[in-house]
UniProtKB/Swiss-Prot annotation:
Name recorded for this polypeptide: Ferrochelatase
Pathway, per record: Porphyrin-containing compound metabolism; protoheme biosynthesis; protoheme from protoporphyrin-IX: step 1/1
Record's subcellular location: Cytoplasm
Any one of the GO CC terms: cytoplasm
Reactions performed catalytically: heme b + 2 H(+) = protoporphyrin IX + Fe(2+)
Gene3D superfamilies in alphabetical order: 3.40.50.1400
Major location category of this protein: cytoplasm
Family to which the UniProt record says this protein belongs: Belongs to the ferrochelatase family.
Amino acid sequence: MTDHALLLVNLGSPASTSVADVRSYLNQFLMDPYVIDLPWPVRRLLVSLILIKRPEQSAHAYASIWWEEGSPLVVLSRRLQKVMSEQWKQGPVELAMRYGEPSIESVLLKLVAQGQRKITLAPLYPQFADSTVTTVVEEARRVVREHKLDVQFSVLQPFYDQPEYIEALEASTRPHLQQPFDHLLLSFHGLPERHLNKLNPGHSLDGAGDCCAESSPQVLANCYRGQCFRTARAFAQQMGLADGQWSVSFQSRLGRAKWIEPYTEARLDELGKQGVKKLLVMCPAFVADCIETLEEIGDRGREQFREAGGEELVLIPCLNDDPQWAKALNALCERAPLAL
C-alpha cells in the first residue's frame, strides 16, 4: 500500500547563522503560546525584550556548531527521513519543522496535493509536553481547519518508556558505556514548573528524585518530569547500571521563572567538585543532535565541568539516523492511534 503518508516533525532551526535569521526564528518560537504561556500582550513585550540581545548571542552559538550542509538538526532529521523512507512501506515519508522551514502547513498541503488522505503525524519527542507535542498537533489542526482538508490523521504517542525506544538508546550508547567512566548524566530539556502545574494542579515537583514514583497513570501522562525519570530508569535498568552510576538533570533554562530541577548547570558543578573525572552525558529528550546538545553540553557544559575539577566530558550522540532507531520509530508509528 502507498496511500498512508508519514510526517516526521521536529522543532526546527534558523535558516542560517545570520542574526536576522536567528531573530526571525526565535520570534516565531517564543511567540508560540505553548512555549511562553502568558497573555499575548505580556508575551509580546517579553519576547521583544529577549530579542534585543538574544539573537546575536544565539547566532554566535549556532555558528560554532553549524555544518557545511546546514543546521545539524535539519541535516540529521533529513537523514532520518531518508532511512525511514526505507522502513515505512505504506506511503511517502516527509519532514516538517514546527518553527522555520519546511513548515507543517507547506508539507501537509504538499501531501494532500499528491492525493494523500491518511497521514501519521509523528512529533519526534519521546516525552509529552504542551510546548512540544501539543503545539505540533494544534498546528496540524489549524492547517486542516483553515484549508478544509479532507484527511485522516493518526498521531504518534509519547514513547518515553516504550521498549523499542529504550532498546534503540541502549544500542546507540552501549559502545560509550563499555569504556571506563565515573558517572552518566542524563540531561533532559527543562520546562518552567508552571507548564506542569497547569496540567497537574497540586502535583509536587520538589526534590531531586522522581516526582511520579507513586503517581497515578493519569498524573504521569501529563507530567513531563516524571516521564523523563521513567526514561532514565528504564534505560539504566536496560544497561544494568547501579543507582549511584547515573543521575538526571534538566538543561536550557530561560528567564527567571522556576524551572524543573535539578538543573544541569548545577549538576555539572557538583559532579566536578565531587571528584568525577570522566563524565558521560546523554540527552534523551532530543532524538537528533542540535544546539542544545552540541553547543550547550558539548562546548559550554564541557568547559564548565572542567572548571569544576572534572577532566573529560563525553557527549554521547543522540539517536539521529541510527538504523535501529528508525526501525523502532517505524514500529511506534505503525501503532499510532487515530486522532484529530
